[in-house]
Amino acid sequence: VNDYEMMLNSITWTSFLLYYFAPEFFFPNIFIYRFFDLHKIADMFEIDLPSIPKKSNYKARCMYYWSLCEVFYRFRAENELSPAELCAFLYDFAPNFMPQKEADVPQPTQHGVSVD
């Protein structure tokens, strides 16, 4: 197993540990499961994110977290946020601030009744 592939598989837990021990520099990264949400937040609040590495480049994908830490460190410093306030911004305020699209339920193509 490639070391970077293994690290990538544990990046969420590693990010929580890094945040626990050094919250000034790291943030808990749960966006690995909600990557599109991170980009919507960045677009909404004009945060320049680093370019996304190729899926096959495990080293670059691992290092992407470090780049995100640098970006959010600067964002936190510029906006005078504490580490806890950055987490509140990323995981509570920003997702709830973004307009939600209401999904239209498509009309059924067939009508039927099921009788037991």
Can you say where each PLM-predicted feature lies in the sequence?
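A sequence-level detector for short glycine-anchored, His/Arg-bearing signature motifs
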Residues: N9-S10, D116
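Conserved beta-strand->loop/alpha-helix structural units within folded catalytic cores of enzymes
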Residues: T12-L17
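Helix-hairpin-helix/helix-loop-helix acidic hairpins
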Residues: V1-N9
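C-terminal accessory module of base-excision DNA glycosylases/AP lyases that mediates lesion recognition
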Residues: P28-D116
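Short, polar/flexible loop-turn hinges at active-site or ligand-entry regions and domain interfaces
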Residues: P23-F27
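Hydrophobic/aromatic-rich effector regions of fungal transcription factors
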Residues: L18-A22
